[in-house]
Amino acid sequence: KLFLLFDDFKPDAVINYAAQGEVRNSWKWPVEWYNTNCISVVKITEFLKDKNYLKRYISVSTPEVYGATKLNLSESHSYYPSTPYAASKLAGDLHLFTLFKKYNFPVIFTRAANVYGIHQQLYRIIPRTIIYLKSGRKIDLHGEGRSKRAFIHIRDVSYLTMKLILGGVNGEIYHLAPDDNIVEIRNVVDLICKLLNYKFENSTNLIKKNFGQDSQYSLDASKVKNLFNWKQSIS
């Protein structure tokens, strides 16, 4: 049905947001993660690679492919995936790179900081914290919430994605990340607790073990900032 829709609508741009995105669960069901994040990508792009109507394919990738690092990563950083989720996403990316090199497939890759905003999946840390607080449940913070992340609002991500559709370069990777520093997850939860008048200590379970997730990564987004003279609109 999807292929019929492609030929019916003949889109000049396709943005692939579809993915199995939960890192911890990728250890439980790696086959499903590879089927969605790699095999499905191969099937879709194998169909699209010969379509004259397609001018741009945006692959929404992930910085998890770099593994844990304290560096401010550029787009040329080497890959070191440490979870089935990251490895499955990288496998899909590498296939797309081969299509670009062989057929000049019009792919652009985006790798964003942690995205937040309206209609976010409820298992993500910000909506999950709010739901748990309101329902009287304690929030489990693996690794005691010491993992560090940067956050970018979906409006900024959407704006940059549209700019890349119109003015990006095929075969290139672009980091989408804010100007401010990365923060510990526990500090994000603590801020939400304060805004909703809850005590952090009474609302969280600090679990020492942090199974299957990178402790930290940060992205250098100067490439996209310089290309479009962009500054984040929401922080």
Q: What are the residue ranges of the model-derived segments?
A:
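Conserved active-site region of classical short-chain dehydrogenase/reductase
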Residues: 38-46, 123, 155-158, 162
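Hydrophobic alpha-helix immediately C-terminal to the catalytic Tyr-X-X-X-Lys motif of short-chain
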Residues: 91, 95-99, 129, 188, ...
